[in-house]
Amino acid sequence: MTILNHTLGFPRVGLRRELKKAQESYWAGNSTREELLTVGRELRARHWDQQKQAGIDLLPVGDFAWYDHVLTTSLLLGNVPPRHQNKDGSVDIDTLFRIGRGRAPTGEPAAAAEMTKWFNTNYHYMVPEFVKGQQFKLTWTQLLEEVDEALALGHNVKPVLLGPVTYLWLGKVKGEQFDRLSLLNDILPVYQQVLAELAKRGIEWVQIDEPALVLELPQAWLDAYKPAYDALQGQVKLLLTTYFEGVTPNLDTITALPVQGLHVDLVHGKDDVAELHKRLPSDWLLSAGLINGRNVWRADLTEKYAQIKDIVGKRDLWVASSCSLLHSPIDLSVETRLDAEVKSWFAFALQKCHELALLRDALNSGDTAALAEWSAPIQARRHSTRVHNPAVEKRLAAITAQDSQRANVYEVRAEAQRARFKLPAWPTTTIGSFPQTTEIRTLRLDFKKGNLDANNYRTGIAEHIRQAIVEQERLGLDVLVHGEAERNDMVEYFGEHLDGFVFTQNGWVQSYGSRCVKPPIVIGDISRPAPITVEWAKYAQSLTDKPVKGMLTGPVTILCWSFPREDVSRETIAKQIALALRDEVADLEAAGIGIIQIDEPALREGLPLRRSDWDAYLQWGVEAFRINAAVAKDDTQIHTHMCYCEFNDIMDSIAALDADVITIETSRSDMELLESFEEFDYPNEIGPGVYDIHSPNVPSVEWIEALLKKAAKRIPAERLWVNPDCGLKTRGWPETRAALANMVQAAQNLRRG
């Protein structure tokens, strides 16, 4: 029984973000569709070759996506919302981009599909839309074309397909309500057709992703798996693939399915290998997800070997990444600025492929010398002084309940804040960032590269901040922001100013579409050596009589959007960050900043996948926010911002944050989210986002007014704020000015009644 290895997927964007650049060039009309398609082909060929050279036996094909793999699946099934359909019924790459972005080089602009987080990761997918009586047919053959490409290059191909039950689970019903699971029998014929096409091509194994099987699914959904897979069996071998959690709670459902193998995430799940081996049918292959696809740490391969060695020779076995390597940067070897000791602790996607090759070889031969050698740096890290800071650990241990309580309740604070700020009804503001123009990015890059001295850099940033204040005053906004010209990324910026983080040059991972992020890496205990945001906030406030918000990224979001340490709990990391930022709140307040926004867009996405684990997470997540904010005086108004959230199931925790104002992303869901605030009788102030900043389309005054009137039916108008959904960093100034002018006009119209 020779053990093979494979990955569940590989990063798509390219080492130098070639895909991002090609997409954006095409969208801007600066390159042709053929040029874009060529970049995709080149990247796929390179990535297959790189995995093969690193020692991967079975290459994933179908993991590449032009925007998002769930959206690719929607097109495969012919699920195109009517507003995005071509008049002749055809589907092309612009159809896909219109669903994702609201517009493309061809076709009519229309509202983009809703976007939300892929399980509990930082990747986003476009939510499939379902309507009653919908028809499906094989429409977009990207998967088959890419399989042909890989076969022509002589690769050992393992196609990757998002499974039918998970696909339906991830979608939403539009219009007349019905049970979307009832569409299962309508989509299965398309899956059968795809599997038949793959069988024709001589494909042996297909990786069919059903990550919904790690969730606490309703019984009807669990029951749907058997008939679904009964319909799909027989054409090729199916590797039922799960990730992000364990499968033990749903193992009875899984073992009844007519598949030939199961992939389990042995990093994030608590499944016991011996127990899995005992309960799985003896002729099934087990794919052991031993290498973490979601982090950047070098694996202790001696531990991984010990975890799996007892079942070697007892059943067919593959070793694999825990999930797709999409969530990891591509190649550590191009990082030239990382300190050698710290660098030795990491492994990016290509190094993880190498780890899988080492593990496969050791399991096949029994020789573990190479594993011990590879694991030595990560074992040595446990005793490094760069990891442990006794002062931070002591401060954390001394936290009391008092440290997470504001001095007075919201009603008392609100009165003090009204007296201080004297804001009109329907106060207008933005979420924080303004367009990051080429000038701003060039300024930061020149400074970073040493081509610009500190004085000239600061003069340049000050000028961009001044322009942002002038723009906002001209537009008539009530509460201003400094625009964040000095910040490359809302998490990276804070990480750069906190001890305990390190940064990469090319550690990019895809967030959605062409958006990539370069997450900081938490390597040790976290502290704040000096104030971070005070100087620029104070400068911005000196330019205007209107209040300027201080802007902080909250502790849970910094944690969720960084690569965390694996040797301490997430709670410990979050509270260390909270203590560091608590000092920042105190310093902003002392500098005369009266409104401080602590963004927590990631609070909900950090939720464990199983509801039974939610309470513990929410308890420490809320406590971290409160530790951060509680130092503020009564007349300092604390705002928080959250995006892509469904709130109804965590409303208690949202209220427990005790922020004076919460701004939320609601425009894509047509104010649906406010339902939860209404039902809960949310006591504090709310700014429901009135337009979608992820789309370049400019909302009309009437559209915004209608949304605000809708909001006022649910929340008393005196507690409503008016703001966009999210920061405006990725937008251009022309559409930003136009959209904000319409937003301010809508608020003024409502004030006049």
UniProtKB/Swiss-Prot annotation:
L-methionine binds at I431, G432, S433, E484, D599. GO terms for molecular function: 5-methyltetrahydropteroyltriglutamate-homocysteine S-methyltransferase activity; zinc ion binding. Pathway: Amino-acid biosynthesis; L-methionine biosynthesis via de novo pathway; L-methionine from L-homocysteine (MetE route): step 1/1. GO terms for biological process: methionine biosynthetic process; methylation. SUPFAM superfamilies: UROD/MetE-like (SSF51726). Keywords: Amino-acid biosynthesis, Metal-binding, Methionine biosynthesis, Methyltransferase, Repeat, Transferase, Zinc. Pfam families: Meth_synt_1 (PF08267), Meth_synt_2 (PF01717). The active site is at H694. It is an enzyme of class 2 (transferase). InterPro entries: Cbl-indep_Met_Synth_N, Cobalamin-indep_Met_synthase, Met_Synth_C/arc, UROD/MetE-like_sf. Its cofactor is Zn(2+). HAMAP family: Meth_synth (MF_00172). Catalyzes the transfer of a methyl group from 5-methyltetrahydrofolate to homocysteine resulting in methionine formation. This is 5-methyltetrahydropteroyltriglutamate--homocysteine methyltransferase. It comes from Escherichia coli O139:H28 (strain E24377A / ETEC).
